Amino acid sequence: MNQKILNILTIILTVILSGLQMLPNESNNVVLQWIRVYIYWIAGISAAIVIALHIIDLYRGRERHIKEWLVTFLKHILDEHLAGEIYQTRISILRVERGYKVFFKSLFYFVFSNFCNNFKNATWRNSLKDIAIHVMSDYLTVYVRYSYPKSKQSHAYFRLSDNADRNQFNGIANKCIEEGVPQFVHTVDISGIDVTQPFEKLSNNEKCKVRKYMKNSYFAPSYYGSLRLMRRISNNLYAVPIALSDQSIWGVIIIDNVSDKKCDFEKDLAPFMSSYMKIINFSLSSLKKR
């Protein structure tokens, strides 16, 4: 929970508790009479809420600090090796999450958070399509990200393919998770193509480019819809699996960039990546896998 919100709620509830002590013993006001009758219930519930909020904050505080540390560390990697001449580069950590969790997150964001925007731009149909409805599947979601320059918060998700054993993947991250080895891709740039529209409505030239991009980036044809959720479609991609101490795959780190020039992240980071991954793996070792 945001620390500022927690502090504000604590102050409000503390004021309520203090105000209860100042109530007059006798009053003709119906509301004050009701409060006087239930004063101990109100005080008890208010105190319980304050305590519960602090317990929740303590429970979630560790993960919040881990995220802050990881963002700082990702910034170090980017600034040290990938910033400057390599512009528009992002480095992200994606984690595996259960489908029902992603369902509620996507429902809240695409429907409730964008409620006014959906009415204004008549985008209800696309928003409903963007909800993660496969609640029994696993998804990859953005856990932390640092980009140069800074980008907006991402709500993209990638459903892990049920046919990965037949080389039917939902992108390079899915392939990296399934095979447990780093993956690197440099392919055609399709960032200028509007992939929010159905594939059939693309021009023949655009279809050709999108097919090539999906093939090279390990998107099976059935996962064309995944492109619509991506704020930026990069053509230089480097994925490295994140394995915990028990050798289970927790997620994947992705470095991506949009450029006609090949950005060989795998080669550039080869002398350092092993040490960096050990630090990331250790930082995430105290968290649950999903």
Question: Model regions: which residues?
Answer:
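Intrinsically disordered, low-complexity terminal regulatory regions
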Residues: 28-164
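Non-catalytic regulatory/interaction regions at protein termini and inter-domain linkers
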Residues: 4, 8, 222-225, 258-261
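Juxtadomain coupling helices with adjacent low-complexity linkers
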Residues: 246-290
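A short, aliphatic-rich beta-strand micro-motif
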Residues: 236-244
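Juxtamembrane "helix-exit" motif on the non-cytosolic side of transmembrane helices
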Residues: 19-30
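Short glycine-rich, low-complexity/disordered patches
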Residues: 85-96, 185-193, 289-290
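Regulatory sensory and allosteric helical modules in signal-transduction proteins
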Residues: 120-230
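Juxtamembrane interface helix immediately N-terminal to a transmembrane segment
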Residues: 1-15
